[in-house]
Amino acid sequence: MSYILAEALNFVRRGISHLNYWGASHSLSADNYWESNFQGFPRLLSDSSKAPSTIRTVQVLEDDVDDIAIQYNKIVRGPLDYLLAIPGKDIRSKLIDSFNIWLQLPEEKLSIVKDIINLLHTASLLIDDIQDASRLRRGKPVAHDVYGVAQTINSANYAYYLQQARLKEIGDPRAFEIFTRSLLDLHLGQGMDLYWRDMVVCPTEEEYTRMVMYKTGGLFNLALDLMRIQSRKNTDFSKLVELLGVIFQIRDDYMNLQSGLYAEKKGLMEDLTEGKFSYPIIHSIRASPESSELLDILKQRTEDEAVKIRAVKIMESTGSFQYTRETLSRLSAEARGYVKKLETSLGPNPGIHKILDLLEVEYPTNEKGRV
């Protein structure tokens, strides 16, 4: 039985003991006690006609409690498990493995960090797809189209607290502060991204980069900080992690508008339908302030392929894709240089170099400007 499920069962058992204690000293019906003390919580017995008349006679077999907790957990996790079953790029797990070449955590500790990050990332995608009104995720229908918006939001929130509960497995009180700070950063970054989109405010490149450090870098930093507090080595990787987060997000922005494979997995140029101010779009708008055409297209949240292709042509005319590739090349070179400095004291790390190789972008090869 998993740690989290065991904790849930213990909670229910403590509740039953509490009920029995109060029932022994108060003449109170089960219905009245529940309504006065546990409003909003589900009953263990859904049919009140089958409930005993007084609390002192309440008896619930432990097997029944186990079955109920298992059933609730399975239902609530539905959207989360749905997305977990669809393979992703797994870049975060690869990143954790790469840094562990230096930090040398044992497998059992590393596994806990991976699980926490994977569940948090998956939960954030559930929310992200709702906020962006997405239709596809990893080539499949988004979870909220299968399970509904309300259940998907609840499943994502449930996942956050599931992982918070796992922090005690790390065995360091600093883990909770690290976890809280990282989730705050993630939500701050996401909030600014949504604000610019919904208010139709085009940020500067500097503002966008800062947002990415919060939004994308939040989980990257969480993973590395949880690893560091368990390692005998205490090297500060924050600069490298920030660079990797920015590279990852700008590359994702580029691929959204240029990659045919991305279109199959996420939808054709979905950032345009979302109305998102991604890196190439920001550059194009600011490179041609006298023209409002691209901004006007962005406002429409269009799903029309011809209009999207027109938007791409505008970005090509302002050199925005070339500029984005040059930015990625510069950031990658900076990251590689930083890795080499770290390697002089920590030893070779081929894993990080492979990550950077994976984040290299291809050049467009067809008439639509998409590879």
From Swiss-Prot:
It is an enzyme of class 2 (transferase). GO terms for biological process: paxilline biosynthetic process. It is found in: Peroxisome. Dimethylallyl diphosphate binds at R137, K215, T216, Q249, N256, K266, K276. A motif (Peroxisomal targeting signal) lies at residues 369-371. The record marks Y160 as: Important for determining product chain length. Pfam families: polyprenyl_synt. Isopentenyl diphosphate binds at K89, R92, H121, R138. It comes from the Eukaryota. PANTHER family: GERANYLGERANYL PYROPHOSPHATE SYNTHASE, PYROPHOSPHATE SYNTHETASE ATMG, PUTATIVE (AFU_ORTHOLOGUE AFUA_8G02400)-RELATED. This is Geranylgeranyl pyrophosphate synthase paxG. It comes from Penicillium paxilli. The gene is paxG.
